[in-house]
Swiss-Prot record:
Glycans are attached at N104. Keywords: Disulfide bond, Glycoprotein, Protease inhibitor, Secreted, Signal, Thiol protease inhibitor. Belongs to the cystatin family. Residues 1-20 form the signal peptide. Its main location: secreted. The lineage of its organism: Eukaryota, Metazoa, Chordata, Craniata, Vertebrata. One of its GO terms (molecular function) is cysteine-type endopeptidase inhibitor activity. It is found in: Secreted. It comes from the Eukaryota. The keyword Signal applies. The keyword ATP-binding does not apply. It comes from Bos taurus (Bovine). Pfam families: Cystatin. This is Probable cystatin-15.
Length: 128
């Protein structure tokens, strides 16, 4: 029975350190976060079969892991009239009517801005 007490105390001591690796809210305008958003949208456009490009409509959630450069983002994307390899997709008009698809995506991106290296750890998207 008493052998459980040191184990419990050890778990209590580790609790804050374990929780520190959870995602926490951050601002949507930070430079590293913005670069990760750009990378995630580029990756989405490159790996989806549609030849039209999607662009960012708004950021629904912006978070990062404490003490790391791993970012979690929920993005709302809209289908444009531009092709995915066109220049300046951000200024491209959205498609109207039944072709005007929108998707909600969640991306987890690990960044190494010093090396300009980004890695997509996970992504899920759902058409709305």
């Amino acid at each position: 029975m008493f052998w459980k007490l040191p184990l419990l105390l050890g778990l209590l001591a580790l609790g804050p350190h374990v929780c520190s690796w959870m995602f926490e809210d951050i601002g949507k305008t930070g430079q590293e976060f913005s670069m990760c958003v750009e990378f995630a949208i580029h990756h989405f456009n490159e790996h989806q079969p549609d030849e039209n490009a999607y662009k960012l409509l708004w950021v629904r959630r912006s978070q990062h892991k404490k003490f790391s450069l791993t970012y979690l983002m929920d993005l709302h994307l809209g289908r444009t009239i531009c092709k995915k390899h066109d220049e300046d997709i951000d200024n491209c008009p959205l498609q109207e009517g039944p072709e005007g698809k929108k998707v909600n995506c969640t991306f987890i991106v690990d960044s190494r801005p010093l090396y300009t290296k980004f890695t997509l750890l996970n992504s899920t998207c759902q058409q709305i």
